[in-house]
UniProtKB/Swiss-Prot annotation:
Residues 194-199 are annotated as: Involved in NRG1- and IGF1-binding. It comes from Homo sapiens (Human). It is found in: Cell membrane; Cell junction, Hemidesmosome. Residues 29-73 form the PSI domain. Palmitoylated by DHHC3 at several cysteines of the membrane-proximal region, enhancing stability and cell surface expression. Palmitoylation also promotes secondary association with tertaspanins. Residues 1129-1218, 1222-1321, 1530-1625, 1643-1739 form the Fibronectin type-III domain. The lineage of its organism: Eukaryota, Metazoa, Chordata, Craniata, Vertebrata. Residues 131-329 form the VWFA domain. Residues 1113-1140, 1400-1444, 1495-1525 are annotated as: Disordered. This is Integrin beta-4.
Length: 1822
């Protein structure tokens, strides 16, 4: 059991010592954590331990030292011990010529949050073995590079022998994967892609590493070039195989491995799109796959490796890459090489002639750098390597000295949390084998882990222990009660209510006042010490507060009252018992003018000029009292002044005239003023306390001090002498100038009068500089008489070769800022140096007005800005004059004109009405400056202020050259003309700044505590200077000014500046008002490698106590006041949005002594590491500059002298909505001259949830001014962003506006003005397949919006809610053409006679019979004469609504085409029409079916006799019922954005779907028949994808569809081309940096076939949308689709909008393939194809068709889609293939693309030699 216990006094002493020595933060974590078990305790902090002593009554979770001090036995304390053991250590042998590291292995176990430091030794010899492997691109464009490499074999060997005596050299080559699209797979190209070349391959190891240089040269001579198609190469495959195939390549274990990668192209990488195009989906397995010939074999089955894979494998095998690339691909590899710890990048010349020099330079650079990285480290462990011997570079490697044993410090730290989860809850992140590896050798292997063991006492618990009254388990020294029991021994039933009466306070109905729990007749209060008393009636947070602190922080709250510390009294402990604060400067109490009460003086006679100890404030009396007494003294003593006469009687003091006045130090104040009446000066003094009263006396000197008598008679004489004096001065000046010119010609005189710079070189360090200029002294020697002016200039970046040439090539029209400095002809005052004073503002306005007036004569000059004033030290006799500094923006080419004009105006001493001093100006451009300085007579030294052009992009060491040009005025000669200035930019080891740019403090705090933080980038100490600067607060009146240095020791990251605040005097309130006092603290002069960060200046706002918000809530959440003054977590955090960009966050102060609070806030969903920090001195803060309608998370902690306390609970809050921005660009689909379809994009910044749009349109005149009222349309569905506007006035311009509304209101409008009639016309082309995006080729390169068709817009307003088609039709249908005013492009209308309108239901079997009598349905399936068509048994949705006998087919209305088939067979089973049941077709009937084209993949197409995209539905009534319920709709938008000449972003909008989406599929292929590629997107929230490695100037077709659990939805299709300039020698390789545009294909428009007779047809097509030149004609070829005959060619001349060709001599029932190409002066463009068949059949009994009918079908035969046409001589119209038909008007679809890509357009079919009228449709975008 327990041993002897220490005495209570010993415990007390030990606890006091520990409380002083230990950090409060650690104690807080162990004691404050809400733990319930031993295991939870030891995981809180690395220093936490647990006491299992049964008799222990204190808190069991604490530090081990405090548990011992509290009486817990050492053997009862559970603590987890860390371990560190070196398992392998071999000392470094410097005699060996190989890289070594010591130790080689260790085992370490750490507790969460614990760190372990150890040293690591690494040795790199002066010379080590080198393995050099050259990996070269063997594509055709590298042929000259290969030839040069063959010639340079001897030079390569020579360089290697200079680098090391032990080397091997090898060679490998690569091209790309031998598959489509990377390689041309035609047999002849696979054999020889280029003349005299090898077959294509992926990678081949040609020469393994060998010491025989001759063998290397001989084998290299036999190599030939190869080739591929696309520009990027497959070099990543080659690099990976080179790394992992160590035996095949021949890497030696102890040598330096160098891999030279030479190419001129970009690279393929994992999942970049080319692999998908090639059908390769599996990842690279990172294994060696070389055959016996050294050829890579798995290029067809495995993807390219990723960049992280290559980085990891090259580091694992100690391979250092050297990228030797040409300028064309330099930008790609410039970023790539930064991912490798140690690598090199060099620019390879076009023919690789400099590869040897590049290799030598790279090797020298690499061998001086060493990188040490931790590989395979678990997420719970962090490793950091530092060194005191070697400097760290930007990339993290060390700049080493080879031949020395380097010592490195390794820090291994076990994290407590990983991504917000405790590391002990993540078993996979707790341990691992870390490989600490340097660049050139094997490294240290660490078996590291985190201790997350369970306490052994928890595994040995006593279940239902007798110690716990059999009502609980005894675990780790205490009882864990079962449910329903409580108490230390679980002997109290929580369910018993019989004993709560003793816990009820008189007059209350809640036991324990609602603040505790009644257990066995006794109250157990909540809050762990917050509530006290028999009934928990006292709240220890409700005692009085002073300045926000409980009991003034000078006592504790007990039983509802403050128990004050010794020396303090009062209800809130705010009165000191001593009178130390009342002692005056003489040692008395309140200067004898009052008494001391509660530590403050209460003066008997209060005055404006008495301070807090009743002492007269003479500094406040002097400036105000003299002025107050002046008028009364003047009128009483001399009878003069403004109060002379009766008003003099108002003076309330007496005047006594005396002969002599006392000295100033003997009286309160001594004053002197000038009497305006006689110009004499009178003096007086004031005695006493300085407060004039009725009994006060002012002593006045009897005698005034008057000036001597006047001499008015001299004035006329002087007026006469002035002209003579002027003439004399003029003659003297001429004589002196002549003498000086003569003296300048004499050698003896000339030699002694020189000007020049004092020094010829300055060396500056940028981190020690306090300004961006340098005052460079210039001396004048010899005779100092007269005036000399020196003209000078400074040039930046003299160290860069060719810098002047580069500067000359810069755009001359580019606007650059010019700095201008002038010396004004006026003295400088203190107010001019303060930018917020009125005098400064007036002068600034005067300067800017006059200078703008002068410089406006130079073209392109903007107005002045940033005007400020200063003084120039060391400026001779004019250093008290005002210098103005300003900036004006002007073109770069305007510099000579600016310089000439400035010199001219300075010589004239005026800029318009602004007077300036001569001989001084400075004009600063972006890279140079010119100026002028003046030596006045007798002046020996002046300073030249030289700008230093400090910029972040400067070189580490840059040079400036200052040059004295000439002496335009004066006789001096130039001595030292040149000054070199060198500026060294050291890499910052750390950055020092303030925590925030502004702090708010209370005057009652007495001290402003300002945190200064240091972001440590490297070890060592840092130092900065600081000083305060007055603002509206004044030093020694509001605060005590301070200045000094802050020294950060190594590892220190936070310091605090303290500025003492002074109490506000009453006189300050009267004289200075209630303005906010603020002063500034600035950091400067960083030392020891420190840099100043932002902000390096902060503003301190002093708020008076009555200004602060002191509202504290009376009820607070329970929290234990921690012992020893530790801080708790702030309570009751509350956040409330104060606007769209503000959140008000407040909380209740914690217990303890908080000095301030730190608020951390971030956007919800972001990582907490991206949080913003804010400091506050009061328990509330306003978060500003937030995003509207955005969710934020925040929490707060308090900090004090011992550090930060715990954070509060997390609070989230959403900002209010803000009005949205204007909608996206408006797009117009011009249907006719009076009908347009208007669409718009969603606002770029919705700032909330869009609820509606408002569209307004109205007439405007020629000046775009409105005519009459605007019409408004409210679109209350925010997803419908389209509107069809009809009945507009023809040939009239309209103004259209669209604005959006959210919860905050209406946003700004987007406006467009367009006249439909004035737009260019072209033949109408309405796709049968809707929702195809149309790209406006004339809109430039901005493709944010697209014109498109939408079934949301093209609905019939009087029809159903969705476009629908049904074959539930009644009999006796009659077609009525929609011509004239009834023309509606949105509908195809079939009308029944009113007497025959049926009423059909979903189960109706009624069918259609073409003008046949209506009969009952035939379910028997037998044929009959004149019978009706039986309905298919295939289940379908309800039938179409019939209104007024009209059935509306949406046109184009849906994504499916309409197909009406006619047949003359007597009775046939159309088994191909339905995959489920036979579909019977009678000889005299017609059926309406639906053809699912290539944009809709039907799930019902199972028959192999049909094309895969063909399906027939017998009854479909609505848009939503075309597919199974829950199947996604078509994505509602398809948008293309070009990212480069070979990359494209494809975006779409989420489709409607009743079920959750599971992802998307994106397919794309070349329009002319390339291989199909598919991208699967499993994330339904991702609605865009980037497609790389497209071929430039090639057309691609894209299809997007969505998937739910019910299956795939319909597709959205679009065609796009990226046009760019290509390399002359490689047509598929775009020129780097060339412009690229997004466009549609330049093929002719869709082909339209019109059958004229059984053996002839008419072919028509449109002019290409992008002709790319002048069209001179077309080439049309016709051939049999199945072969069997030669092709026939036709030439069609002209450039009309639509061209036609009649083709005779065709055969019936034979499919023909037609191709049309446009011909320009540059050649033929891409071709448009179509297949047509003229079928001739006998006519059936169709009265409206006659004997022949035209039948259009769309089976996909072979790889083309085709159209079958049956000629008819009928004059009546009919519906064919879902197209619009009228009298003598039939439109057919034309096949445009191969495979599954079809583009259907409506066209005219002439049946009787008469052509119907065309309708126009244009597309424009504003």
């Amino acid at each position: 059991m327990a041993g002897p216990r220490p005495s209570p006094w010993a415990r007390l002493l030990l606890a006091a010592l520990i409380s002083v020595s230990l950090s409060g933060t650690l104690a807080n974590r162990c004691k404050k954590a809400p733990v319930k078990s031993c295991t939870e305790c030891v995981r809180v902090d690395k220093d936490c331990a647990y006491c299992t002593d049964e008799m222990f009554r204190d808190r069991r979770c604490n530090t081990q030292a405090e548990l011992l001090a509290a009486g817990c036995q050492r053997e009862s304390i559970v603590v987890m011990e860390s371990s560190f053991q070196i398992t392998e250590e071999t000392q470094i042998d410097t005699t060996l010529r190989r890289s070594q590291m010591s130790p080689q292995g260790l085992r370490v176990r750490l507790r969460p949050g614990e760190e372990r430091h150890f040293e690591l030794e690494v040795f790199e010899p002066l010379e080590s073995p080198v393995d050099l492997y050259i990996l070269m691109d063997f594509s055709n464009s590298m042929s000259d590079d290969l030839d040069n490499l063959k010639k340079m074999g001897q030079n390569l060997a020579r360089v290697l022998s200079q680098l090391t005596s032990d080397y091997t050299i090898g060679f490998g080559k690569f091209v790309d994967k031998v598959s489509v699209p990377q390689t041309d797979m035609r047999p002849e190209k696979l054999k020889e892609p280029w003349p005299n070349s090898d077959p294509p391959f992926s990678f081949k190891n040609v020469i393994s590493l060998t010491e025989d240089v001759d063998e290397f040269r001989n084998k290299l001579q036999g190599e030939r070039i190869s080739g591929n198609l696309d520009a990027p190469e497959g070099g990543f495959d080659a690099i990976l195989q080179t790394a992992v195939c160590t035996r095949d390549i021949g890497w030696r274990p102890d040598s330096t491995h160098l891999l030279v990668f030479s190419t001129e192209s970009a690279f393929h990488y994992e999942a970049d799109g080319a692999n998908v195009l090639a059908g390769i989906m599996s990842r690279n397995d990172e294994r060696c796959h070389l055959d016996t010939t050294g050829t890579y074999t798995q290029y067809r089955t495995q993807d390219y490796p990723s960049v992280p894979t290559l980085v990891r494998l090259l580091a694992k095998h100690n391979i250092i890459p050297i990228f030797a690339v040409t300028n064309y691909s330099y930008s790609y590899y410039e970023k790539l090489h930064t991912y490798f710890p140690v690598s090199s990048l060099g620019v390879l010349q076009e023919d690789s002639s400099n590869i040897v020099e590049l290799l030598e330079e790279a090797f020298n650079r690499i061998r001086s750098n060493l990188d040490i990285r931790a590989l395979d480290s678990p997420r719970g462990l962090r490793t950091e390597v530092t060194s005191k011997m070697f400097q760290k570079t930007r990339t993290g490697s060390f700049h080493i000295r080879r031949g020395e044993v380097g010592i490195y410090q390794v820090q291994l730290r076990a994290l407590e949390h990983v991504d917000g989860t405790h590391v002990c809850q993540l078993p996979e992140d707790q341990k691992g084998n870390i490989h600490l590896k340097p660049s050139f050798s094997d490294g240290l292997k660490m078996d590291a882990g985190i201790i997350c063991d369970v306490c052994t006492c928890e595994l040995q618990k006593e279940v239902r222990s007798a110690r716990c009254s059999f009502n609980g388990d005894f675990v780790c020294g205490q009882c864990v009660c079962s449910e329903g029991w409580s108490g230390q021994t679980c002997n109290c039933s929580t369910g018993s209510l019989s004993d709560i009466q003793p816990c009820l306070r008189e007059g209350e109905d809640k036991p324990c006042s609602g603040r505790g729990e009644c257990q066995c007749g006794h109250c157990v209060c909540y809050g762990e010490g917050r509530y006290e008393g028999q009934f928990c009636e006292y709240d220890n947070f409700q005692c009085p507060r002073t300045s926000g602190f409980l009991c003034n922080d000078r006592g504790r709250c007990s039983m509802g009252q403050c128990v004050c510390e010794p020396g303090w009294t009062g209800p809130s402990c705010d009165c000191p018992l001593s009178n130390a604060t009342c002692i005056d400067s003489n040692g008395g109490i309140c200067n004898g003018r009052g008494h001391c009460e509660c530590g403050r003086c209460h003066c008997h006679q209060q005055s404006l000029y008495t301070d807090t100890i009743c002492e007269i404030n003479y500094s406040a009396i002097h400036p105000g009292l003299c002025e107050d007494l002046r008028s009364c003294v003047q009128c009483q003593a001399w009878g003069t002044g403004e109060k002379k006469g009766r008003t003099c009687e108002e003076c309330n003091f007496k005047v006594k005239m005396v002969d002599e006045l006392k000295r100033a130090e003997e009286v309160v104040v001594r004053c002197s003023f000038r009497d305006e009446d006689d110009d004499c000066t009178y003096s007086y003094t004031m005695e006493g306390d300085g407060a004039p009263g009725p009994n006060s006396t002012v002593l006045v000197h009897k005698k005034k001090d008057c000036p001597p008598g006047s001499f008015w008679w001299l004035i006329p004489l002087l007026l006469l002498l002035l002209p003579l004096l002027a003439l004399l001065l003029l003659l003297c000046w001429k004589y002196c100038a002549c003498c000086k010119a003569c003296l300048a010609l004499l050698p003896c005189c000339n030699r002694g009068h020189m000007v020049g710079f004092k020094e010829d070189h300055y060396m500056l360090r940028e981190n020690l500089m306090a300004s961006d200029h340098l005052d460079t002294p210039m001396l004048r020697s010899g005779n100092l008489k007269g005036r000399d002016v020196v003209r000078w200039k400074v040039t930046n970046n003299m160290q860069r070769p060719g810098f002047a040439t580069h500067a000359a090539s810069i755009n001359p029209t580019e606007l650059v800022p010019y700095g201008l400095s002038l010396r004004l002809a006026r003295l400088c005052t203190e107010n001019l140096l303060k930018p917020d004073t009125r005098e400064c503002a007036q002068l600034r306005q005067e300067v800017e007005e006059n200078l703008n007036e002068v410089y406006r004569q130079i073209s392109g000059v903007h107005k002045l800005q940033q005007t400020k004033f200063r003084q120039q030290p060391n400026a001779g006799k004019k250093q008290d004059h005002t210098i103005v500094d300003t900036v004006l923006m002007a073109p770069r080419s305007a510099k000579p004109a600016l310089l000439k004009l400035t010199e001219k105006q300075v010589e004239q001493r005026a800029f318009h009405d602004l007077k300036v001093a001569p001989g001084y100006y400075t004009l600063t451009a972006d890279q140079d400056a010119r100026g002028m300085v003046e030596f006045q007579e007798g002046v020996e030294l002046v300073d030249v202020r030289v700008p230093l052009f400090i910029r972040p992009e400067d070189d580490d060491e840059k040079q400036l050259l200052v040059e004295a040009i000439d002496v335009p005025a004066g006789t001096a000669t130039l001595g030292r003309r040149l000054v070199n200035i060198t500026i060294i930019k050291e890499q910052a080891r750390d950055v020092v700044s303030f925590e925030q740019p502004e702090f708010s403090v209370s005057r009652g705090d007495q001290v402003a505590r300002i945190p200064v933080i240091r972001r440590v980038l490297d070890g060592g100490k840092s130092q900065v200077s600081y000083r305060t600067q007055d603002g509206t607060a004044q030093g020694n009146r509001d605060y005590i000014p301070v200045e000094g240095e802050l020294l950060f020791q190594p590892g220190e990251a936070w310091k605090e500046l303290q500025v003492k605040l002074l109490e506000l005097q009453e006189v300050d309130s009267l004289l200075r008002g209630r303005q906010v006092r603020r002063f500034h603290v600035q950091l400067s002069n960083p030392k020891f490698g420190a840099h100043l960060g932002q902000p390096h200046s902060t503003t301190i706002i002093i708020r008076d106590p009555d200004e602060l918000d002191r509202s504290f809530t009376s009820q607070m959440l329970s929290s234990q006041p921690p012992p020893h003054g530790d801080l708790g977590a702030p309570q009751n955090p509350n956040a409330k949005a104060a606007g769209s960009r503000k959140i008000h966050f407040n909380w209740l102060p914690p217990s303890g002594k908080p000095m301030g609070y730190r608020v951390k806030y971030w956007i919800q969903g972001d990582s907490e590491s991206e949080a913003h920090l804010l400091d506050s001195k009061v328990p509330s803060v306003e978060l500003t500059n937030l995003y509207p309608y955005c969710d934020y998370e925040m929490k707060v902690c308090a900090y004090g002298a011992q550090g930060e306390g715990p954070y509060s609970s997390l609070v989230s809050c959403r900002t209010h909505q803000e009005v949205p921005s204007e909608p996206g660009r408006l797009a117009f689909n011009v249907v006719s001259s009076t009908v347009t379809q208007l669409s718009w994009a969603e606002p770029a910044e919705t700032n909330g949830e869009i609820t509606a749009y408002e569209v307004c349109y109205g007439l405007v005149n020629d000046d775009n001014r409105p005519i009459g009222p605007m019409k408004k349309v409210l679109v209350d569905n925010p997803k419908n962003r389209m509107l069809l506007i009809e009945n507009l006035r023809e040939s009239q311009p309209y103004r259209y506006t669209v604005k959006a509304r959210n919860g905050a209101g209406w946003g700004p409008e987007r406006e467009a003005i367009i006249n439909l009639a004035t737009q260019p016309k072209r033949p109408m082309s309405i796709p049968i397949i809707p929702d195809i995006p149309i790209v406006d080729a004339q809109s430039g390169e901005d493709y944010d919006s697209f014109l498109m068709y939408s079934d949301d817009v093209l609905r019939s307003p009087s029809g159903s809610q969705r476009p629908s088609v049904s074959d539930d039709t009644g009999c006796g249908w009659k077609f009525e053409p929609l011509l004239g005013e009834e023309l509606d492009l949105r509908r195809v209308t079939w009308r029944l006679p009113p007497e025959l309108i049926p009423r059909l239901s979903a189960s109706s079997g009624r069918s259609s019979d073409a003008e046949a009598p209506h009969g009952p349905p035939d379910d028997g399936g037998a044929g009959g004469k004149g019978g009706s068509l039986p309905r298919s048994a295939t289940p379908g949705p309800p039938g179409e609504h019939l209104v007024n006998g009209r059935m509306d087919f949406a046109f184009p209305g849906s994504t499916n085409s309409l197909h009406r088939m006619t047949t003359t067979s007597a009775a046939a089973y159309g088994t191909h029409l339905s995959p489920h049941v036979p579909h019977r077709v009678l000889s005299t009937s017609s059926t309406l079916t639906r053809d699912y084209n290539s944009l809709t993949r039907s799930e019902h197409s199972h028959s192999t006799t049909l094309p895969r995209d063909y399906s027939t539905l017998t009854s479909v009534s609505s848009h939503d019922s075309r597919l199974t319920a829950g199947v996604p709709d078509t994505p509602t938008r398809l948008v293309f954005s070009a990212l480069g000449p070979t990359s494209l972003r494809v975006s779409w909008q989420e489709p409607r779907c009743e079920r959750p989406l599971q992802g998307y599929s994106v397919e794309y292929q070349l329009l002319n028949g390339g291989e199909l590629h598919r991208l699967n997107i499993p994330n339904p929230a991702q609605t865009s994808v980037v497609v790389e490695d497209l071929l430039p100037n090639h057309s691609y077709v894209f299809r997007v569809r969505a998937q739910s659990q019910e299956g795939w939805g319909r597709e959205r299709e679009g065609v796009i081309t990226i046009e760019s300039q290509v390399h002359p020698q490689s047509p598929l390789c775009p020129l780097p940096g060339s412009a690229f545009t997004l466009s549609t294909p330049s093929a002719p428009g869709p082909l339209v076939f019109t059958a004229l007779s059984p053996d002839s047809l008419q072919l028509s097509w449109e002019r290409p949308r992008r002709p790319n030149g002048d069209i001179v004609g077309y080439l049309v070829t016709c051939e049999m689709a199945q072969g069997g005959g030669p092709a026939t060619a036709f030439r069609v001349d002209g450039d009309s909008p639509e061209s036609r060709l009649t083709v005779p001599g065709l055969s019936e029932n034979v499919p023909y393939k037609f191709k049309v190409q446009a011909r320009t002066t540059e050649g033929f463009g891409p071709e448009r194809e179509g297949i047509i068949t003229i079928e001739s059949q006998d006519g059936g009994p169709f009265p409206q068709l006659g004997s022949r009918a035209g039948l259009f079908q769309h089976p996909l035969q072979s790889e083309y889609s085709s159209i079958t046409t049956t000629h008819t001589s009928a004059t009546e119209p009919f519906l064919v293939d879902g197209l619009t038909l009228g009298a003598q008007h039939l439109e057919a679809g034309g096949s445009l693309t191969r495979h599954v890509t079809q583009e259907f357009v409506s066209r005219t079919l002439t049946t009787s030699g008469t052509l119907s009228t065309h309708m126009d449709q244009q597309f424009f975008q504003t």
